[in-house]
Amino acid sequence: LFAEGTFNAAFIPSYAGALAKNKMNADNFAKKVFNLLFIILFIFVLVAEIFMPQLIFLIAPGFYKDPEKLKLAVDLSRITFPFLFFICLASFFGAILNSYNKFAAAAAAPIILNIVLIGSLFFSQWANISDVLTLSYAVSLAGFLQLIVLLFFARKNFKPILTTKIKIDKKIKFFFSKLLPSIFSSGVTQINILVGTIIASFQAGAVSYLYYADRVYQINLA
């Protein structure tokens, strides 16, 4: 939801509008949003890492019939879940760049994931280690690299400062009042995917088939 357009749809108009009036005020607003996003994502990922078995039960209850499959799902999910943290923060910096009419870096950043995944397969063959584990670590690494790349390009226009002291003013409240409806509307697609995964988890290989079908569906959306 945050990484695939919902956040940008709410943030860019607010930030760009503030930027047109006063850059300092716009940057203060962006810093508050960044710190809130950082804290929320960090807590969410940390809780998910701790309670991953329970999370897998909610997402794919059918895996509980096979202890070996369940353990693999939990282990791999714990490895790949930090990707969510990195990619959402990367999306934030992509929104900053878009607000300055700089689109190339944000548009090209997803290529990093493909390059890292392909490279990890060559590495796993060369090092004679598990393809599955290598790809899982590669996903989180790719998310981290996307964040670093977009931060590098955005730093000329915006420099984030991490702090836990965040004043929730009217602008922040207004921003989240616009973000919540976007989350609910965009969440319909995610709920469909979740329901499909829950049902598919009871059939061997069905989750993979569902994922491949979704990839085909996403082709026309780039």
Residue ranges and their predicted role:
Residues 1-222:
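Membrane-embedded alpha-helical bundles of multi-pass transporters/translocases
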